[in-house]
Structure formats: C-alpha cells, structure tokens
Amino acid sequence: MTSKTVLYAKHLEAGAKMVDFHGWEMPINYGSQIEEHNAVRNDAGMFDVSHMTIVDIQGEQAQAFLQKLVANDVAKLTVPGKALYTPMLNEQGGVIDDLIIYFFSNTSYRLVVNSATREKDLAHLAKISADFAVTVTERNEFGMIAVQGPNAKAKTATLLTAEQNAAIEGMKPFFGVQTGDLFIATTGYTGEDGYEIVVPKEQAADLWQQLLDAGVAPAGLGARDTLRLEAGMNLYGLDMDESVSPLAANMAWTIAWEPQSRDFIGRDVLVQQRADQSTDKQVGLVLEEKGILRSGSKVIVDGGEGVITSGTFSPTLGYSVALARVPRSTGDTAQVEMRKKLVTVKVVKPGFVRNGKSIL
C-alpha cells in the first residue's frame, strides 16, 4: 500500500506521471523532465517534499543527545534558526542517514530526515534517546514544498504577508524561521537559491496553487535528481549508505573532530580511517563525448577500480556527469565500462553546476 502526500490531487491536476518512491506515490515528471530542470536553473520550480520526515527534539538534554547522535556538532549552533547538515552514523562509521538540524534553543531542535529511511531513523532515534531526558516527536501534520531557482525567492515573496516577508528578509543560507503558520528555510537540494517551506497540511494545496499562479513550475523527482547531481549533492542509498564511511562520500567537512571529548557514534572508526587513509574517496566524472554515465558502472583507474554511484545526462552542461567512489590514488582521468568497451572520462571534484553556471 503506497502513501500519498497531501499534494497528490494537485499532481494529478497538473498531469503528473506518478511512480512509487520508497512507498510514496510521487511525481517523476509533469511532461518534460528537462523543461522542469531548466525552469529551476533559469527561473523557479517547486517540488513536493512532503514525504520527508520532520522530527522535533525537545528537552533539557536535547543538545547532549544530538552531540552523541550525529557526527557534526550542534554546539556550533547558537543563533535561533541556524541549520546544520550532518550524517548520522552507526557504530561501524557507516551512514544511517544524512539530515538537516535546525536550532531553536539548546533544548529545542528540528530534524528533517529522508523518507526512504524513516522507519530505521525513528527506531534509531528512539533507541539512542532512551538514555537522555528528551522527547522525540514526529511532526506528520505538516507538508513541505521546496521552491528553488534564481527567481524562487521573488516569486514566493508575492504571496507572503508583510510580516512574513519582513521575517525572511536578508536571511542567509541555511537558516529557518517560523513566521505565521509557515516555517521557511533557506535550504535546498538543487544548487540554486530558494526556500523549503513547512506548511500545515490543510494549507498545503492552497500554497501550491498560489505558487503555481505566481509562475513557479512544478517539478518532479526526475528533475530533482539531475539538479542535485549537477550540484554534487549525495542521494542516500546510492552515494552513501550504512556500509559507506562519510570519508568515502565527500562528507569529511560534516564531521566535527573537535572537541575530542565528544564521543559521537562511529567516532572511533572514523578517527582510525582518517589516520590510515583507508577509505576510498568520492570524485566527479565528466564524459564530454556521446554516452551516459550510469549508476553501478565500473570505474577503472591505475592500480584499482571503483564504481559510479550516481550518473546522468546534465541538461545544464549538455553532456554526462557522475559521482563515483574510487581509490584514493585516483588521478585526473579514469576509464568507465560502457557498452562493453572502455571510455576515458575526466576526474574532477564532486560538483558541476552552481547557481546555473558550470563550475568545472
């Protein structure tokens, strides 16, 4: 039995092609994935992300609990609304999930975690929180809409109240604020400016329609995937999972090694991996000739081999790009098995497009 988001009827109205996405009926596209992709890069597009899981953590030990739970350090968060991206690890240093944490106070935080990992995430939160004076509350009374693109903020502003516009004016990236009934955050998964808006379920369809009327194009999971891949952003389950260290997934920047006294789950394994440089690394791959780099393809480098974790045709660049996990010794080029022959690809840092422009 698949679940439906509160915006299901709006997707059907817009002619969406629906697919089963980890138990949720979600739009893969509304007719043209490439047009939806380009709308986000050049103007404004919106995604139904109501399948994401919102969890509020409250209590006198909320900060201590999160300092144990995640690899990044929530003590860095001191300004209300500031957000932090972090992996949540198992004892072997593998990634249970990646998530965003919003800081309200030292006793109140909000987590946004992936839909595909909801059951195991909630079970893990329940298990670890048992040792702390905290409450863990799933907020399934909300929907969520991501509005992304160079004109996303301006178009959103046209349908907010004066008070709401004042509350978000000049808000830096990776912040969120509750204003009226909406929680509006300057986060996203596209490499563009925009907002992620948490809205009470009963208001979600109206907000979606207002955004449509303001000229924001609906975009499906297909465009969401090509946009995040161009931006070099990981997709859980493909680019990392419980068997993959964050050090092998371009996530070293999300690990707070100091203070050394903070004993987060998985720390000892990561410290050893960092010391002996034992993990693979994540790189970007670029194929400027014909062909599409595909997830699961073998990557052959001097002295070893790796694997493409995510690959696609990049509508912005006009050729194929990929994220791959490869040996640390990998140089500037590699070879990929395509149609039973080896094709040479360029090896670059993960990330290909930001704010509509190539960063290669």
UniProtKB/Swiss-Prot annotation:
Source species of the chain: Pseudoalteromonas translucida (strain TAC 125)
UniProt cross-references to Pfam families, sorted A to Z: GCV_T, GCV_T_C
Biological role stated in the UniProt entry: The glycine cleavage system catalyzes the degradation of glycine.
NCBIfam families: gcvT, PRK00389.1
Molecular-function annotations in GO: aminomethyltransferase activity; transaminase activity
Superkingdom field: Bacteria
Subunit structure: The glycine cleavage system is composed of four proteins: P, T, L and H.
Residue ranges the record marks as coiled coil: none
GO biological process: glycine decarboxylation via glycine cleavage system
InterPro entries, alphabetized: GCS_T (IPR006223), GCS_T_bac (IPR022903), GCST_C (IPR013977), GCV_T_N (IPR006222), GcvT/YgfZ/DmdA (IPR028896), GcvT/YgfZ_C (IPR029043), TrmE/GcvT_dom1 (IPR027266)
HAMAP family for the chain: GcvT
Gene giving rise to this polypeptide: gcvT
Signal peptide: none
Family listed: Belongs to the GcvT family.
EC number: 2.1.2.10
Gene3D superfamilies per record: Aminomethyltransferase beta-barrel domains, Aminomethyltransferase fragment, Probable tRNA modification gtpase trme, domain 1
Protein name in UniProt: Aminomethyltransferase
